[in-house]
Structures are given as C-alpha cells and as structure tokens.
Amino acid sequence: ILTPGEEGSNGAVSRAQEMAAQHPEWCFLYQYANDANPRAHFEGTGPEIWRDCPEITHFVAGLGTSGTLMGVGTFLKQQNPDVKIIAVEPPLGERVEGLRNIEDGYIPPVFENWHGRDVLDRKRVVRPRESIEWTRRLVQECGIFAGISSGASLAGAVKVASEINEGTIVFIVCDGGWKYLSTGAYTADLDEAEANAEKIIYF
C-alpha cells in the first residue's frame, strides 16, 4: 500500500490508522505507540549495552518511532544519570529514511508516554548527504551492510565525538542496506544518491 511520498512517514501512519479504524478485526501493531517497542529496548538492548560497556558516557540513536531512544535512554539514565542521551534527526523539511524531526507535526506517542523531552539531553541534526557518506563508510571500512538511518546515527555520533575531550560513545546500527539498494546509496554518484534517497521514505 503506497501513500503520497510528499507526506512522508506521517502520511503512512495516518493511512494505517484509517485502515485500522475501518477494519477492527485487523491487527494494528502501531510501532509509534506500542509500548512493547520501547519496553523491548528497556529490557533488552539497554541492559546489554550496560553489561558490555558500563563505561558508556553518550548514547546516540536515530529518532524514528523513538522506541530505541526511549527504552535504552531510560534504562541507562537509571544506571547512571550522567550518561548523555542524544537523538539524531534530519533538518526540518528534509528527509533521512527512517528518521523524523519531532517538530514536523507528528510526535510519536511512545516519545510522549516515555517522557522523551526529559530523557533526551540534546538532539543532533544530520543531513541526508552526511547519512549516505557515513553509510558508505560503514560498508567500505567496517563491512557492515547498514541502512541510511544507521549512517545518520553514526554521523551524529561522530559529531558528538568532535565536541568532547574524552568519553565512550555507543550508537545503534538499526537497519539493513537491502531496503536502500534501489536508491543507489552504495554505488551511485553521491549527488545522484542523495537526490534518489530524498524521494523515498522507508520503514
């Protein structure tokens, strides 16, 4: 089911809500509001990070459904309130696949229900071109076939690293590259890849 590209993920969410209302017999998982989303990261991802990297000083992740940030961020703050929780988002009006700017008219219920503004210490803005550049570096230098929102998270983490004297930064590789093959993100000229990637929103 396709929704108008210019509506971005907001349009897709709205369409899904309409369909769920029309078909109450359907199961609507609604990851933007489903408490199981942040709960999985609060009970799983967060404890795993803390177990393996208790020296963490900064956690950086993309702001999409906000489930990862809310679950991991809440858990880490409970372990050490000094850990900085940083959201990566695209500039208002620009697209980075899988991410959102919470000023664009839709705030995920997960973000509100988990007191997102209290959990986050700050946000870092990452442009589509930066996202693609760092996605390519993940593939070429690390052998990780990551998606563009993962490249955005890495770009945000690099920005954080440039601003501190020392620390331990953890970021999340949250998607695979197979969803982005048609955009040319891995092979095309960078200008062309950026233009193609901005036309499509993936989930």
Predicted feature locations:
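Hydrophobic/aromatic beta-strand patches that form the interior of the parallel beta-sheet core
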Residues: 27-29, 60, 86, 124, ...
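Short glycine/serine/threonine-rich phosphate/pyrophosphate-binding segments
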Residues: 63-73, 149-157, 180
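Gly/Ser-rich phosphate-binding catalytic loop and adjacent alpha/beta segment
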Residues: 1-20
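Active-site/ligand-binding-proximal alpha/beta "capping" segment
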Residues: 23-66, 72, 117, 129-145
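Active-site/ligand-binding loops adjacent to catalytic centers
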Residues: 13, 78-148, 163, 184-203
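Short, well-ordered alpha-helices that flank and scaffold nucleotide-derived cofactor binding pockets
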Residues: 51, 74, 78, 158-162
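Conserved active-site loop/cleft motifs that coordinate metal ions or position small ligands
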Residues: 145-148, 168-173
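Glycine-rich beta-alpha junction loops
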Residues: 33-36, 64-67, 89-94, 103, ...
